[in-house]
């Protein structure tokens, strides 16, 4: 299974929704709070082609996008294949 990383921040409803979706699908993930780890914000910007919104979600080095993109993958039953 690929490593899942969620770049997120506090008081973020979309971040919470993404984490609930991952938990509901029993997908382990690493949570990075970009407000605490400022260098990680620069890392997120670099990996996501400058996207500043959170969450930004990655499966290994594959940029999934934010919550809406993650939710679309779940609805289309594509999460499992992307994690292989």
Predicted regions and their residues:
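Residues that form or flank phosphate/diphosphate-binding pockets in enzymes
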Residues: 16, 39, 65
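Thioredoxin-like thiol-disulfide oxidoreductase module
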Residues: 34-50
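Non-catalytic, surface beta->alpha helical segment in thiol-disulfide oxidoreductase systems
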Residues: 59-84
